[in-house]
């Protein structure tokens, strides 16, 4: 090393070349924050997601909501024209697989006994007239299970367009796609009163990218400023201020540049790397500079190049072991996160550890090289300044504390020691302190919530968060969860038994989980097809009511197409299981009573298809008959009772009236299950009926069935109005429990989609957190055991770190800060940095123990030598991370707060728990090999020179 330092320009040139090389790589770094990127690609959740997309299409959704602010309804000719233009232009985009909107979504209807598929506008018959607007609204009402709060909101003022994005598209491509979509929407809606909101995974990723760039441009200069101020206060010299800073800036460029070179994606958690390196990595340079000034102050005579080199080498020799040990332990703390299955945590751990290693390397090479180039005539000034350094800083700190009344004039330097004596100075006190930590931590940890929803990263007042909250409140929700129901053979999913169970599952989930906004599946289409195929035939030219009643019934608008599409029912008119009585019990039984199935099966025995009488013949006759006012009120009263009496809603009353006549086929909006209602002899033939429906259906079911004619697997789409992974987890568990109890044998259910991935990530965060903590604590134990040649050293050194982690989780629990992908790094930071304080104290205590057998004296001297340094370093690191409080992201603000707290607790515990245990247990590894030579006390109260 000495020979190398004689040629400092070799070191400086090499470092400069490497820095320029990595700096040039920074421009190619890719910023991305998609859920798919975070998950392990070999994990079950990720593999299932991709298999599902290969079969059913992409699950990357991008929503556009349009809200009218002046009209009573968004359904106007002008707005429909805007929606149609946006739809058509978006369909032309290469990365868009599908577009669903008010103008192109499928509408299933029956005409003259045939099954037809069209759109809500009516195809070529659409003219934009007021009558057309009414027909569109009536069609939306006609199929509530499909369109309610999807195509049109409850108040009629909001509609949405759903775009399906190609899952193979990169983050860069999605950013460009989003720009194109924004331009299309802006151009189409220009001059209208429509308020536009965009949401979905691509929008979230782009918003995170934008906010990250703002953070990096703001926070890095701030943390640099904090470090500069801290270093200048410490050294009062340019070398002492800028050399440690230079090493961490270069190490940051190397670390992030290497990420870009290796094509590692820069995520939100990676944005903490520069802050962490600048805040933590400067410690090594500070050690080098401090010992350099100390060695310089001890040098005698005229300074020469050779003597200056000896001073530098002396400083390196004195500090190299301590710096190396501190660096290794810090690296070990960060490396522990590599055990996580989550990709962003792995990359954060790897490149932060590399950055720390780079900072360590540069501290022992670049700083000495630059110091060696210092002109000899300026070294004297540095020497003079360094001789006054310790006393000046000490007096300033003491004067400040005395000024504010925090200490008396006699005890300023003993404050950390006095704090130790108060909390852990006796065996009783250290025991009570540990018990208090355990009890308080246990209470707080019980309150800790594990939730990995990425929406929580955004402030509530951010535009994206407001848009998502608006859609969750007014439409079906932005959180998409999917279930896959799989049989054993092709055609298994046409059997009435499983279709009935799937329908029951949907109703059960909706009732038990109010956060669900909508469930759509294969059964939704089967029920609709069954309905339109059983609409009673009407005589268009027959007067339905007596002349005396014409005026009364004219006020009831049944539409202009003989009742084929319209009814005067409201939102729940066409739900076959909507009455309150159906949901008396929140358990499974109210949705799938086995007795109901048995009764239905028993009633099917002996049933003959030849003896079947089509009830629609009677329904058609009733619908074509004249009705008196008295008969109408009898019908109304009957419907009122059937709908629940005093608890009845208008919607349910109308529904019961419609069912009495099978109006618009409403009595057949069901899974064909009851054999007596159909011209079949067995339930197996009902399966054939479903297959015939699929054959007749001219639309596509690719999103919901793997095979349109004989499906083996179907997909259920669940839209959730809440982003919490706790809600998602409950829905998934409810579905699995229901399926286990009520699905026929041979059928399975699995969850997938982005919501399921976030839920799975929550479990991974917990397991990776426990693994990384165990790994890092083990590393601490091994390092300390080897360093002090005793396993007791490992145990004692690990205890304050364990307590620090427990207190961190306690604070998170009480402060309602969720444990998620980002906050899971705190424990590793606590161990990686906190171990430095432990080692520093143990090393000094052991050195003092070799000089004295009086434990109080040893402890007090240890505090005098190491206490202030530990506190200062903790303060510097805490302030460095505290700049995260100015982040655009809520979660990074939490990280800033937590790291600051962790620095306080880890340093405090190192200065209380460790000396308390050492003085109570008196472990043998602290005993000196040679009996210490006692000192004589000087009159000034300072220890005499060591002998």
State where each predicted segment sits.
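Pore- and gate-forming transmembrane helices of large, multi-pass membrane proteins
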Residues: 216, 245, 284, 297-340, ...
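Solvent-exposed, non-transmembrane loop/terminal regulatory segments of multi-pass membrane proteins
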Residues: 26-74, 80-81, 128-151, 166, ...
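Extracytoplasmic
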Residues: 47, 54, 92, 97-237, 249, 679-780, ...
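Signature of alpha-helical transmembrane segments and their immediate interfacial
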Residues: 1-33, 368-369, 373, 377-454, ...
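Transmembrane alpha-helices and their membrane-interface boundaries in multi-pass membrane transporters
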Residues: 13, 278-292, 320-339, 344-401, ...
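Interfacial segments of transmembrane alpha-helices in multi-pass membrane proteins
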Residues: 5-6, 213-266, 339-343, 771-817, ...
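Juxtamembrane segments of multi-pass membrane proteins
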Residues: 405, 412, 418-422, 426-561, ...
């Amino acid at each position: 090393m000495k020979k190398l330092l004689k040629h400092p320009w070799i070191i400086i040139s090499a470092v400069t070349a490497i820095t320029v090389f990595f700096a040039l790589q920074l421009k190619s770094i890719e910023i991305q924050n998609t859920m798919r990127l975070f998950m392990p690609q070999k994990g079950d959740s990720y593999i299932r997601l991709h298999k599902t997309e290969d079969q059913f299409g992409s699950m990357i959704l991008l929503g556009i909501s349009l809200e009218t602010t002046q009209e009573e309804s968004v359904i106007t000719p002008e707005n429909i024209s805007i929606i149609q233009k946006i739809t058509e232009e978006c369909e032309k985009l290469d990365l868009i697989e599908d577009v669903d909107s008010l103008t192109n979504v499928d509408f299933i209807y029956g005409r003259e006994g045939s099954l037809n598929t069209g759109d809500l506008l009516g195809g070529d018959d659409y003219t934009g007239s007021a009558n057309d607007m009414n027909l569109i609204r009536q069609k939306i009402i006609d199929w509530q299970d499909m369109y309610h709060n999807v195509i049109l909101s409850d108040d009629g003022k909001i509609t949405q367009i759903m775009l399906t994005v190609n899952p193979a598209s990169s983050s860069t491509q999605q950013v460009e796609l989003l720009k194109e979509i924004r331009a299309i929407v802006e151009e189409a809606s220009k001059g209208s009163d429509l308020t536009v909101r965009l949401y979905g995974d691509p929008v979230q990723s782009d918003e995170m990218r934008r906010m990250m760039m703002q953070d990096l441009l703001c926070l890095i200069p701030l943390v640099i400023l904090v470090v500069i101020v801290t270093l200048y206060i410490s050294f009062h010299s340019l070398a002492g201020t800028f050399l440690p800073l230079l090493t961490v800036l270069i190490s940051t460029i190397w670390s992030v540049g290497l990420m870009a070179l290796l094509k590692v994606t820069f995520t939100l958690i990676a944005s903490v790397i520069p802050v962490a390196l600048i805040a933590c990595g400067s410690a090594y340079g500070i050690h080098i500079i401090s010992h350099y000034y100390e060695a310089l102050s001890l040098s005698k005579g005229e300074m020469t190049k050779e003597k200056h080199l000896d001073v530098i080498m002396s400083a390196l020799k004195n500090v190299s072991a301590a710096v190396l040990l501190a660096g290794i332990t810090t690296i070990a703390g960060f490396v522990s996160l590599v055990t996580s299955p989550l990709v962003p945590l792995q990359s954060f751990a790897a490149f932060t550890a590399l950055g720390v290693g780079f900072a360590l390397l540069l501290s022992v090479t670049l700083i000495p090289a630059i110091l060696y180039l210092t002109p000899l005539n300026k070294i004297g000034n540095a020497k003079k300044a360094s001789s006054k350094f310790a006393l000046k800083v000490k007096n300033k700190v003491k004067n400040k504390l005395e000024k504010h009344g925090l200490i008396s004039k006699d005890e300023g330097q003993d404050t950390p020691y006095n704090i130790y004596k108060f909390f852990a100075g006796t065996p009783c006190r250290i025991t009570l302190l540990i018990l208090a930590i355990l009890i308080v931590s246990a209470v707080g940890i019980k309150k800790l919530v594990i939730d990995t929803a990425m929406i929580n990263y955004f402030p509530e007042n951010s535009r994206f968060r407001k848009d998502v909250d608006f859609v969750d409140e007014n439409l079906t929700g932005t959180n998409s969860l999917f279930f896959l129901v799989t049989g054993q053979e092709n055609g298994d999913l046409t059997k009435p038994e499983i279709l009935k169970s799937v329908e029951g599952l949907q109703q059960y989930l909706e009732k038990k989980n109010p956060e669900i906004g909508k469930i759509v599946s294969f059964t939704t289409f089967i029920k609709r097809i069954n309905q339109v195929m059983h609409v009673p035939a009407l005589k268009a030219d027959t007067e339905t009511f007596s002349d005396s009643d014409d005026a009364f019934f004219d006020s009831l608008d049944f539409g202009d197409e003989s009742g084929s599409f319209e009814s005067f029912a409201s939102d729940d008119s066409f739900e076959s299981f909507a009455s309150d009585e159906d949901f008396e019990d929140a358990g499974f039984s109210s949705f799938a009573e086995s007795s109901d199935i048995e009764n239905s099966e028993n009633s099917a025995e002996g049933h003959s298809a030849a003896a079947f009488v089509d009830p629609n013949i009677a329904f058609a006759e009733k619908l074509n008959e004249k009705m008196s006012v008295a008969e109408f009120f009898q019908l109304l009263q009957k419907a009122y009772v059937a709908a629940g009496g005093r608890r009845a809603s208008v919607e349910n009353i109308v529904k019961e009236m419609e069912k009495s006549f099978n109006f618009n086929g409403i009595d057949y909006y069901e899974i064909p299950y009851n054999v007596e209602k159909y011209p079949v002899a067995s339930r197996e033939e009902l399966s054939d009926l479903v297959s015939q429906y699929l054959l007749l259906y001219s639309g596509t079911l690719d999103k919901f069935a793997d095979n349109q004619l004989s499906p083996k697997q179907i997909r259920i789409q669940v839209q959730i109005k809440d982003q919490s992974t706790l809600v998602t987890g409950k829905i998934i568990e409810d579905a699995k429990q229901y399926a286990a109890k009520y699905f026929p044998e041979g059928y399975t259910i699995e969850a997938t989609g982005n919501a399921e991935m976030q839920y799975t990530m929550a479990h991974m965060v917990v397991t990776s957190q426990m693994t990384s903590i165990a790994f890092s604590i083990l590393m601490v134990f091994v390092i300390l055991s080897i360093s002090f040649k005793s396993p007791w050293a490992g145990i004692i050194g690990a205890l304050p770190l364990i307590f620090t982690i427990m207190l961190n989780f306690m604070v998170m629990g009480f402060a309602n800060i969720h444990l998620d992908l980002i906050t899971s790094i705190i424990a590793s930071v606590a161990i990686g940095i906190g171990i430095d304080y432990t080692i520093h104290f143990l090393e000094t205590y052991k050195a003092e123990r070799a000089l004295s057998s009086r434990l109080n004296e040893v402890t007090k001297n240890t505090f005098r030598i190491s206490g202030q340094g530990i506190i200062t370093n903790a303060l510097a690191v805490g302030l460095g991370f505290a700049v995260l409080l100015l982040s655009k992201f809520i979660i990074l603000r939490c990280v800033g707060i937590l790291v600051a707290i962790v620095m306080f607790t880890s340093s405090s515990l190192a200065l209380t728990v460790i000396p308390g245990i050492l003085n109570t247990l008196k472990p043998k590894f602290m005993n000196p090999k040679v009996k210490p030579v006692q000192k004589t006390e000087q009159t000034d109260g300072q220890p005499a020179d060591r002998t």
